[in-house]
Amino acid sequence: MTEQKKINLLDLNREGMRELFASFGEKPFRSDQVMKWIYHFGVDNFDDMSNVNKKLKEKLKAECEIVAPEISVRQQAKDGTIKYALVLEGGQEVEAVWIPEKERATLCVSSQVGCALECTFCSTAQQGFNRNLKVSEIIGQVWRVAKDIGLDGHSEKRPVTNVVMMGMGEPLLNVKNVVPAMELMLDDWGFGLSKRRVTLSTSGVVPALDLLKEKIDVALAISLHAPDNALRDILVPVNKKYPIEEFLAACRRYIDGSKANKDVTVEYVMLNGINDSTDQAHALVQTLKGTPCKVNLIPFNPFPGNEYTRSSNSRIDRFSKVLQAAGITCIVRRPRGDDIDAACGQLAGDVVDRTKRLAKKKMRDDNAIAVNIHQA
């Protein structure tokens, strides 16, 4: 007879926790007490929950567990940024990045093992795709890193003040698990972050963005990276299915009903000679007309096997000035953690690729070499 798998409490939002505790014959406040121990004090041992009665502790120990991904590698950059490799059930790894600043500490978390969207300038996309992360594996990144930095429930300084869903994967291809995880980030019995301090970034899965609007209100960022469909089709292939005009219309629908968003943050990676000319800056101004937004220009962060190069500071400056002259708030993002491959677009993890993307690429490359040799 196989042993029944225990319920991981990190997989449950407040509603799920209260339903579970009701099935134990317990009142909602008992569920809230346990959530406070987990998320405010970083406790994962039921015996350490001093205001939980012995009978309930025994029930919890018999049927439940609190299990987050484990840290396998912790790398600290010169600027204080820390990149974590976190081991999942089954042995695969995802990466999360903690970015300290004077008044806040932002954690970039992953939503999938790998990514299926194949954006050409992103290291994660080159790893292929394996699976969606569970709720416990998403919120568990926040829990594990906060605990590593110093989550104890006593310090006034929070180890994590902001969370951005900008790590490995496309969050809107995992709405089922991303939404409950973000609910735990926002919940007062969870991490208690404000709506404006939790940001979801998407490459443009339009139907899922409309679905998100009905489920949760958080800050929205979009991976645009091109001023027109012709170029974006190449850089961000999901654009072939959901072109820019449809994507931006969905963004407007989302922020129209949002209290967390007055505008959308547009992310634009600066690729030398690809998308960084002043003509393209003017085209971007036209594309963004009618969409309340601010633009983050992101200097490209190189990774092995990629042929793109970073735009020069002068090209980025000229591009930025065109946007600013048109009245668009524009920020050039300073690379953080690039000396440990923790910057935007550099996260890779350890992915068993179910899409066989790497194998197919190698086969194409090998075939191209064979053709060249034959023609020589």
Swiss-Prot record:
The keyword Nuclease does not apply. One of its GO terms (cellular component) is cytoplasm. It is an enzyme of class 2 (transferase). It is found in: Cytoplasm. Residues 101-339 form the Radical SAM core domain. It catalyses: adenosine(2503) in 23S rRNA + 2 reduced [2Fe-2S]-[ferredoxin] + 2 S-adenosyl-L-methionine = 2-methyladenosine(2503) in 23S rRNA + 5'-deoxyadenosine + L-methionine + 2 oxidized [2Fe-2S]-[ferredoxin] + S-adenosyl-L-homocysteine; adenosine(37) in tRNA + 2 reduced [2Fe-2S]-[ferredoxin] + 2 S-adenosyl-L-methionine = 2-methyladenosine(37) in tRNA + 5'-deoxyadenosine + L-methionine + 2 oxidized [2Fe-2S]-[ferredoxin] + S-adenosyl-L-homocysteine. Disulfide bonds join C108-C344. GO terms for biological process: rRNA base methylation; tRNA methylation. S-adenosyl-L-methionine binds at G169, E170, S201, S223, L224, H225, N301. Reaction proceeds by a ping-pong mechanism involving intermediate methylation of a conserved cysteine residue. HAMAP family: RNA_methyltr_RlmN. This is Dual-specificity RNA methyltransferase RlmN.
